[in-house]
From Swiss-Prot:
UniProt keyword Protein biosynthesis present: no
UniProt entry tagged with the keyword Electron transport: no
SUPFAM superfamilies from the UniProt entry: Nucleic acid-binding proteins
Protein name as catalogued: Small ribosomal subunit protein uS17
GO-annotated cellular components: cytosolic small ribosomal subunit
GO BP of this protein: translation
Transmembrane segments: none
Alphabetized GO MF terms: rRNA binding; structural constituent of ribosome
Entries under InterPro entries matching the protein: NA-bd_OB-fold (IPR012340), Ribosomal_uS17 (IPR000266), Ribosomal_uS17_bact/chlr (IPR019984), Ribosomal_uS17_CS (IPR019979)
Family from the record: Belongs to the universal ribosomal protein uS17 family.
Assembly behavior: Part of the 30S ribosomal subunit.
Length: 86
């Protein structure tokens, strides 16, 4: 029987690639303020495993949740959706 992949997938922008086989991805979301009814940008930074060191700063990437790889890394790079210009 085939196992289903129920892992969460997120898309974000690479903000750091200084580590070996690791990147930091910033995920932005919009949240409605409960009092002012205005939508505010909120962001989360996640450390992701990049086995091939293919992501660069500014790239838009897709990451997937996985088993904990280290103290900070529990996500892995799936693909580079869009490369940074320049």
């Amino acid at each position: 029987m085939a196992e289903e992949n129920n892992a969460r997938t997120l898309t974000g922008k690479v903000v750091s690639d200084k580590m070996d086989k690791s990147v930091v991805v910033q995920i932005e979301r919009r949240v409605r303020h409960p009092i002012y009814d205005k939508y505010v940008k909120r962001s989360t930074k996640l450390h992701a495993h990049d086995e091939a060191n293919q992501a660069r700063v500014g790239d838009t990437v897709s990451i997937e949740e996985c088993r904990p790889i280290s103290k900070l890394k529990a996500w892995t790079l799936v693909e580079v959706v869009e490369q940074a210009k320049g």
